[in-house]
């Protein structure tokens, strides 16, 4: 076997059964990318990793929660630098543990069978100890909306480049809590009207198309809509648009490096 195959076997053997126990029974592979999917009411959770054939390096990706309706609608909108659909990308992304990050860096420095084994063991621990809490956090739209309203800026939670994250967020609000959407549109209007923040006019055109289409999509259910939730986003007073945009760009840059 090649070094990549040796590392992959040693890495995967530690947690293959754990994924099955936790419901990640659907498997998909595209080239060097391996993804395991678990369905929930509004979409599916994704756990994935990449095994680089040339070097033997294995990189674990943070878990993802894909809201299928959101992702389907987003695919219908054309916008600049649109990435090809990926089986490993969802609407929201979790975080890996500090121990996993350390072992990931060790693997990157020395992609050996030993480092693959240690990373596989820590991946098993992560699945057993952390994955369920991630699923609970991102399985109910109403709970997500409530959490978003306490954040410094709601779009920070969504995957993608800063403008794409806002697109995802607006679609999600339309489906999950449309009564809160006007406030989010007011904020996003300010972003896309600013040439300092969004230089490409193509984004403004795509944004107008999205705004026109948003009312066509009906909410998931009034049961998950946060009708009684009135705490406003702190975005208005605590943070400047420029500071938020810089943060989102940095966040997206880190995500791209991890792919």
PLM feature spans:
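Intrinsically disordered, low-complexity regulatory regions enriched in serine/threonine/proline
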Residues: 2-12, 28-259
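Short secondary-structure junctions
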Residues: 20-29
